[in-house]
Structures are given as structure tokens and as C-alpha cells.
A protein has these predicted regions:
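Residues that define the transmembrane beta-barrel architecture of outer-membrane proteins
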Residues: 55, 73-77, 148-152, 175, ...
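Repeated loop/turn-to-beta-strand initiation elements of outer-membrane beta-barrel proteins
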Residues: 57, 88-91, 164, 230-234, ...
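Extracellular loop and loop/strand-boundary signature of outer-membrane beta-barrel proteins
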Residues: 46, 65-67, 139-143, 166, ...
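Gram-negative (and chloroplast) outer-membrane scaffold detector with strong preference
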Residues: 89-194
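Outer-membrane beta-barrel translocator domains and adjoining extracellular loop/strand segments
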Residues: 72-76, 104-109, 168-171, 190-205, ...
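Residues on the lipid-exposed face of transmembrane beta-strands in outer-membrane beta-barrel proteins
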Residues: 61-63, 79-83, 93, 154-158, ...
């Protein structure tokens, strides 16, 4: 057994020595630059490239829809204005108003249905099931919900990919994929803060009123453009707006250890972090109407 181990060890040492020797005497590799001659010398990678963006203003009326909302969905009407410094870089802003069109979810309808039944059965709020929600549910749950009133977002846009899309092997459209990011200023309506005292109650007629404020958050996302003709395109865009707010008007934090339990009042601690998502459809108009073409 010992003899066998010695033979195996000698073979391994020999293999390692051979490998080191090959590495030591390997000649260095050298690369040679290929110099093009003739008509291709100094030519660009693509000729007659349509510069859909360079030097043009982009005016894009748009409609946006919030996604994955708990209590109500918001339809935002607005648009985007960009100036394209190059075909791959632009700066501008997106803005929209969302206070006009809001649609409650089925969850909101169910909560209000149970809330109305309990209030009708016990108008004086003496039952235990009413006392537990006295500070969280007003007479009309829909009126205490948080909502996005408006958004203004200056942003920088980068366009790393572009190409063509073929439809039914007969229709060809220029397309591009872009990414954007920047700060967003968001106007919000939320249930106003209350101290839960006699002078500032969190229940009763005045305890469920709303107030407005402005939040500042990052915004980022990506989009696709499908160019219809020389001066217009159809755009689809996904946007993230992460910030903290009280969407349901509930008392969820502020008391107990680390303020993770209800405290029978409405404060800034009750605002929960939400990754708000928006889907936008736009019709893009480019000025001047004629695009440039590369050499």
C-alpha cells in the first residue's frame, strides 16, 4: 500500500513539474491591428442612419395608470417634454395630474360594505368590534383614502438600444429602448394627523378629514418607442415611484417598541413605504418634423 501511494505521489509531482515548465516557456501572444484599405477605410459602422432624436424636441401627451393599488387606482393625465442633445441622451420632465379620476378597488367596496352594516346595527358605537376600529374607519371609508394629486419629475434619459421591428413581414418600424431617472415631486392627499385628544379627536366627524402635502422621491424606469412616421411615435413606459405614505388612513404605527404598534392617533409614523408603479401610454411628437440622417 505504501509503495502504491509513493508511485501516485511521484506521478503527481511529475505532472505538476511539466505544467510549470510549459507555463514558463510559453511564448507571449501578440495582437496585430488590422488596417482597412480601399473604400471601407475610415468609414462609419452604419451609413445613412436615421437620427430620430438628435437635436429635436419631444412633446408627448400621455395617460398613466397606477398599478397594484390596495384601495384605489389613479389615472393620471399629463405629458412629457424632452430635448435630445444626441440620439442617445436627452433631458426633460414628466408631469401629470391624478386628482380627477380615481377608481376604488373591490377591497375598498368590501370594507365600506362591512363598515356600513356595523354602523347601522350599532349607531352609538358601543360594541367591541366597533370600538377596535373607531379611530381607523370613518362613516365613509372612501373619503379617508390617500391619493396622488399631481407629479412633476425632471429626468435624464439614456437610449442604449435601437433597431427595427417587423410586423407580419411587411410593416417595419424603427424602435428604441430607453432608461430614465431623476427626482419626483408628488402632491398627495392623505388623512390628516390627529392627536387622539378631546380637542383633536381621531374619531367623529372631524377625525377623518384629509389634508394635502408634497413628497419628494426618486423616480426611474424604462420605455419603448415605436416610430410611426418622420415626426411621431407611440410610446410605452414603466415608472417606479418609491415613497412612504398612508394609503388607507389607518393608525398602524407610533406606539410600543420601535413604534411598530398603533397608538390611537394619526401621525407621520403611520406612513408605510410603498413601491408605487405607473404604466404610461404616450403619443410622441418631434420638432422639427424632419429627422437628420448620418453620413
Amino acid at each position: 500500500m505504501t509503495t502504491t501511494k509513493q508511485k501516485i505521489t511521484k506521478r503527481l509531482v511529475a505532472v505538476l513539474a511539466l505544467a510549470l515548465a510549459l507555463c514558463a516557456f510559453t511564448e507571449p501572444a501578440e495582437a496585430q491591428q488590422i488596417l482597412l484599405t480601399g473604400p471601407l477605410a475610415g468609414a462609419p459602422a452604419v451609413r445613412k442612419l436615421r437620427l430620430r432624436r438628435k437635436g429635436r424636441f419631444e412633446i408627448a401627451p400621455a395617460v398613466s395608470f397606477t398599478l397594484l393599488d390596495e384601495y384605489q387606482r389613479t389615472i393620471l393625465l399629463g405629458g412629457r417634454l424632452n430635448y435630445n442633445f444626441t440620439d442617445w441622451l436627452s433631458f426633460g420632465a414628466w408631469g401629470a395630474v391624478g386628482s380627477a379620476i380615481r377608481i376604488q378597488t373591490d377591497l375598498t367596496d368590501q370594507i365600506q360594505s362591512v363598515n356600513a352594516q356595523r354602523r347601522a346595527a350599532d349607531p352609538n358605537a358601543t360594541s367591541i368590534d366597533r370600538l377596535l376600529t373607531a379611530n381607523n374607519l370613518g362613516p365613509d371609508f372612501k373619503k379617508q383614502l390617500g391619493g396622488i394629486d399631481w407629479v412633476v419629475a425632471p429626468q435624464l434619459t439614456a437610449v442604449p438600444f435601437r433597431g427595427k421591428l417587423a410586423l407580419f413581414q411587411s410593416i417595419y418600424l424603427d424602435t428604441d429602448l430607453y432608461f430614465f431617472g431623476g427626482p419626483a415631486f408628488i402632491g398627495l392627499t392623505e388623512r390628516k394627523n390627529c392627536a387622539g385628544t378631546t380637542s383633536d379627536p381621531c374619531s367623529g366627524p372631524t377625525g377623518f378629514q384629509t389634508a394635502t402635502r408634497m413628497a419628494i422621491a426618486p423616480t426611474f424606469g424604462l420605455g419603448f418607442n415605436f416610430y410611426i412616421n418622420k415626426w411621431s411615435a407611440l410610446g410605452f413606459e414603466y415608472r417606479g415611484l418609491p415613497f412612504s405614505w398612508n394609503t388607507g388612513g389607518f393608525d398602524t404605527h407610533g406606539g410600543g417598541k420601535d413604534k411598530k404598534f398603533p397608538d390611537n392617533k394619526i401621525t407621520n409614523d403611520d406612513r408605510q413605504f410603498n413601491f408605487n408603479q405607473v404604466l404610461t401610454i404616450s403619443y410622441n411628437i418631434y420638432l422639427p418634423f424632419q429627422y437628420k440622417v448620418s453620413e
